[in-house]
């Protein structure tokens, strides 16, 4: 087994009830050694329970905790209640994966994005909850002996502009910059922004059907685009392997299609 995963590990994974988050939970669950813990969060309780059963089927020697949370209404107190029961002395690796996110209002072009309430709601889920949970995570697990690894699930749209997905582009770009700053300020942390490529998820389908921009809708549904679609299992397996190899600079971004 790889050195990275062959340790008692505590994993916190957001957006774990479906799609990439669910698959990632299962793939990581397969690798965790005995006495490890994986904490799953999402709004959908049924989805979380399904994920838990899928992990248990692969590995019954780890503890799995599920928390139904609304990241649109999150704060430090909520996250502190989740991490408070964890005995931080038990683990050699603490892994936080920020997977939860939303696409935003696809009916708004950039010139239409003028509603502070809509901006605040979007950024609460996609940025503020991320920075808040990260702060709580680092405060709780502050041992010098255990490694702390943070993965920010990102997207090509964090570095490339696309029409009608302004909220999503801004959210992903701001998250990436936050983690670059965090890595610069804390060089001992293991921080990675990982872009899984275009994976056929509910979010991708929503964008391809409901984007206000006709060109984007046609691009996402074109035959040419289909050759670039990544299977969710492949995207998750690559992340697991990247973490195991650890050949990246902390704070950097890696895309699924990178060589």
Q: What do the predicted segments below correspond to?
A:
Residues 33-50:
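Conserved glycine-rich Rossmann-like NAD(P)H-binding loop of the short-chain dehydrogenase/reductase
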